[in-house]
Design a protein with these regions (language model features):
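Short helix-boundary/capping micro-motifs
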Residues: 12-30
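N-terminal winged-helix
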Residues: 31-32, 72, 79-135, 143-147, ...
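Beta-alpha-beta core module
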Residues: 153-161, 167, 230-278
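Flexible hinge/capping segments at coil-to-helix
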Residues: 159-169, 173-195
């Protein structure tokens, strides 16, 4: 057997995930299939690439060597694809996003902003996957979020702009919750609640929540990890969990949204693109489309409109 690009991608994904099970999920294959593939790869490389332990896998010395070469090869292949695409004037622009409120409005606005260039959109549940695919040339542009002080590392050849510098996360809970009648919530009042997070919270969100809750005197129970929007809403409406939520989120039957006193958890929204695939003018148009999509949702909740009006520093900066 000879090593192929898919083998190098599998090795990189295992290193990123830290476990075979999680890497298999991200690759869309079964764990036994990935384990068998790794054994074949190790037979070619001449030794174990990962040391297996109780808490996952870590690259061996040989693994670090193979990973360094694999990332270089994959980067060069990504650059080749991006440069070739840039030469093809009619190539569609590939946009990758995580589940953000502005997404629905962004889709319509990108078609208007980039009239004459087809735009394809894919939704991912992981910021890590978005960034990796952007660096690999599988996306030309990505829209993602960061929480509190966490900064997502970006690959070479990528430029990023901040669409929204700051937004205060609020709480979505059942309309029958004991605190649903309150106008504002203190985080300490939510000790003992069951919290829901996304499957891939690699934007700093869980760390920010745990830190904020620790300051409020408790450790949150991050029990539910669900990426399907409707299922999340159904569980919250049933009183099974509460969740951090963007303040621009629209109303959902059976639930209410309440701001947190002191805004202990804040987020920001960013747009990043491959310079070799996206001309500066198109990047500017995409940025403005993302800003417009966000602003269209500011009035979804009265409490956020009041906060927005009182915090001009949180507004997008347009050149």
């Amino acid at each position: 057997m000879q090593l192929e690009l898919r083998h190098l991608q599998a090795v990189c994904r295992i290193a990123e995930a830290g476990s075979l099970g999680e890497a298999a999920r991200r690759l869309g294959i079964s764990q036994p299939a990935l384990s068998a593939q790794l054994r074949r790869i190790e037979a070619v490389t001449g030794g174990e690439l990962f040391a297996r332990g109780r808490h996952g896998v870590e690259p061996t010395a040989l693994g670090h060597f193979v990973l360094a070469r694999a990332r270089r090869v994959l980067g060069e292949m990504a650059a080749l694809g991006a440069e070739a695409r840039a030469l093809a004037a009619d190539a569609p622009l590939r946009l990758g996003c995580i589940l953000l409120v502005l997404l629905d409005g962004l889709l319509a606005r990108t078609d208007q902003a980039l009239s004459g260039r087809e735009v394809t959109v894919d939704l991912e549940d992981s910021v890590t996957a978005l960034v990796r695919m952007l660096g690999a040339g599988q996306y030309d542009v990505i829209v993602y979020g960061e929480v509190n002080d966490y900064e997502v590392p970006l690959p070479r050849g990528v430029t990023a702009r901040t669409v929204v510098p700051q937004e205060p996360f609020c709480i979505r809970m059942s309309s029958g919750h004991r605190l649903a009648g309150r106008a504002t919530l203190d985080l300490a009042e939510l000790a003992g609640e069951q919290w829901m997070t996304l499957v891939e919270d690699d934007d700093g969100g869980p760390e920010a929540l745990v830190e904020a809750c620790a300051k409020a005197g408790f450790t949150p129970s991050l029990r539910h990890r669900i990426t399907d929007r409707q299922m999340r809403h159904d569980l919250i409406a049933a009183g099974r969990a509460i969740a951090l939520c963007q303040p621009t989120a629209p109303p959902v039957a059976g639930t209410v949204m309440r701001p947190l006193a002191g805004t202990p958890v804040t987020g920001r929204i960013r747009l990043a693109w491959n310079r070799s695939a996206v001309p500066a003018r198109q990047a500017e148009l995409l940025f403005r489309a993302a800003v417009a999509a966000y602003l269209a949702n500011v009035d979804n909740n009265d409490f956020h409109r009041k906060w927005w009006d009182a915090h001009p520093e949180a507004r997008p900066v347009l050149d």
